[in-house]
């Protein structure tokens, strides 16, 4: 990939008020994107956002920039990221733009683009937008300026799309479900989808105020959901993150069910229904228990680099239809073009309803291995600790001790001078000791 100035692996992201997430930058980004995308045709762009207070400011800036370039904006209001991908496809819009920083705190925000088919913008288009950013803004003739309008039925359209991924012959009428929307973009979508499919729904994290997105709620912090599931004696809980592209579940005993377990359930059900084409894609962080459980079922498994973008790339390379990260990004290419928390959750609920099994029992075929993660800070510029002979020697010793019933993964953080030491195996005490032994070797360098 070329050395781009603004676009990262997941669009442009940062703290609001600091470059690049400022009104003037975002206005220019809208204009530059408009100039590039106007070369292609429909001249309309879908703009969605999550529930952050800064979304109002940033969507206005984007709209002004797009209008100056001669493109019209269609606003969805607060809407999950996968909903914007879906609406971009169905409206045949030139692109979709999501204003969100996903699972980050409210004071961060970001801009992410989808192309006309609901997939990520090609690198070449992002590079063309960056090149346009270097130019002075110029306005099209007044008669050519873009307009702005709202898609008044955006939520209803997406609710119907989600429901259509759940089999008609099944119902959720037997289930009591606690849903946690992270005070984010799914707050007016997910409870309605589940209720319309017959579930008894208790909703939490559905009162966004602009600053409480992801705050002690949602997929990145399921403690409130676990407590409520137990208090309500519910059958299960479902948590989404701030922009609705991740899902984490909780069984009736309050146990967390992560993206690895969710993918296992969906892949096994696909196999049972004769609908699984090929295998499943996880990441370097996917639990070894997932790999072994899929192997027992005869389902091929491949690991991609961490990041839903890389999972999708590996799925496309293999021609497979299902992929997931343990953080709850689940991509089902038979249903959607991108990670969709609501759609993934519905496939697990369908497996429960069809088999008359609890979430707890559906997970029982997969034994999760203890996975210990230790972060070790090192001095930036002091060389690569992973290349040091002493670290390599200790790592090799641990790998021999674990044999084929465990894994060691050492990787550098992409954002700060940290080495992430992950050790996985069947015995938690042994795995913990091994992880700290490697961490100590890294510290000693």
Curated annotation (Swiss-Prot):
UniProt record, GO biological process: carbohydrate metabolic process; peptidoglycan biosynthetic process; UDP-N-acetylglucosamine biosynthetic process
Xref: CDD domains = GlmM (cd05802)
Q: What does this protein do?
A: Catalyzes the conversion of glucosamine-6-phosphate to glucosamine-1-phosphate.
Q: Which PROSITE patterns match?
A: PGM_PMM (PS00710)
Q: What is its EC number?
A: 5.4.2.10
The protein's annotated catalytic reaction(s) are: alpha-D-glucosamine 1-phosphate = D-glucosamine 6-phosphate
- How is the protein modified post-translationally, according to the record? Activated by phosphorylation.
Q: Which residues are responsible for catalysis?
A: 102
Protein name as annotated = Phosphoglucosamine mutase
What family is this protein classified in?
Answer: Belongs to the phosphohexose mutase family.
Q: Could you state one GO cellular component term attached to this entry?
A: cytosol
Task: Using the UniProt record, name the top-level EC class of this enzyme in a single word.
Answer: isomerase
Cofactor(s) needed by this chain: Mg(2+)
The record's keywords, sorted A to Z, are: Isomerase, Magnesium, Metal-binding, Phosphoprotein
User: Which of the residues bear the PTM Phosphoserine?
Assistant: 102
Query: What terms describe the molecular function in GO for this protein?
Result: magnesium ion binding; phosphoglucosamine mutase activity; phosphomannomutase activity
Q: Does the keyword Isomerase apply?
A: yes
Q: What is the lineage of its organism?
A: Bacteria, Pseudomonadati, Pseudomonadota, Gammaproteobacteria, Enterobacterales
Quote the record's binding site residues for Mg(2+): 102, 241, 243, 245
According to the record, cofactor stoichiometry and binding are noted as: Binds 1 Mg(2+) ion per subunit.
- Does the keyword field hold S-adenosyl-L-methionine? no
């Amino acid at each position: 990939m070329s050395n781009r100035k603004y676009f990262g692996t997941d669009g442009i992201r940062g703290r609001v008020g600091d470059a690049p997430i400022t009104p003037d930058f975002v206005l220019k980004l809208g204009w530059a994107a408009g100039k590039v995308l106007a070369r292609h045709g429909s001249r309309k762009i879908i703009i969605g956002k999550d529930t952050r207070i800064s979304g109002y400011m940033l969507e206005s800036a984007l709209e002004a920039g797009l209008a100056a370039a001669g493109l019209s904006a269609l606003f969805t209001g607060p809407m999950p990221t996968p909903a914007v991908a879906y609406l971009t496809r169905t409206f045949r819009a030139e692109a979709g733009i999501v204003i969100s920083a996903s699972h980050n705190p409210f004071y961060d925000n970001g801009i992410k683009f989808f192309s006309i088919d609901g997939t990520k913008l090609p690198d070449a288009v992002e590079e063309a937008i960056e090149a346009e950013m270097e130019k002075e803004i110029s306005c099209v003739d007044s008669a050519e300026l873009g307009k702005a309008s709202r898609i008044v039925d955006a939520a209803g359209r997406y609710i119907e799309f989600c429901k259509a991924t759940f089999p008609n012959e099944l119902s959720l009428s037997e289930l009591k479900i606690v849903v946690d929307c992270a005070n984010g973009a799914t707050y007016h979508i997910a409870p309605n989808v589940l209720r319309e499919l017959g579930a008894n729904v208790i909703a939490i994290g559905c009162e966004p105020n602009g600053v409480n997105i992801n705050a002690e709620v949602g997929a990145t912090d399921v403690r409130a959901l676990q407590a409520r599931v137990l208090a309500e004696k519910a059958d299960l809980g479902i948590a989404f993150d701030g922009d609705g592209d991740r899902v984490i579940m909780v069984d009736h005993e309050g146990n967390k069910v992560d993206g690895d377990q969710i993918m296992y359930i969906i892949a096994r059900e696909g196999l049972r229904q004769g609908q699984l084409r090929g295998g499943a894609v996880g990441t370097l962080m996917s639990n070894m228990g997932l790999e072994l459980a899929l192997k027992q079922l005869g389902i091929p498994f491949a690991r991609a680099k961490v990041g839903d973008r890389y999972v999708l790339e590996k799925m496309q390379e293999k021609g497979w239809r299902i992929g997931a990260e343990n953080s709850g990004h689940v991509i089902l290419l038979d249903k959607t073009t991108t990670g969709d928390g609501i759609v993934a959750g519905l496939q697990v609920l369908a497996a429960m309803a069809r088999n008359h099994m609890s979430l707890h029992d559906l997970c029982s075929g997969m034994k999760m291995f203890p996975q210990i993660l230790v972060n070790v800070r090192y001095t930036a510029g002091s060389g690569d600790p992973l290349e040091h002979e002493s670290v390599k020697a200790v790592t090799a010793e641990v790998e021999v001790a674990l044999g084929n019933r465990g894994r060691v993964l050492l990787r550098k953080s992409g954002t700060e001078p940290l080495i992430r030491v992950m050790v996985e195996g069947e015995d938690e005490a042994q795995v913990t000791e091994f992880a700290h032994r490697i961490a100590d070797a890294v510290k000693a360098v």
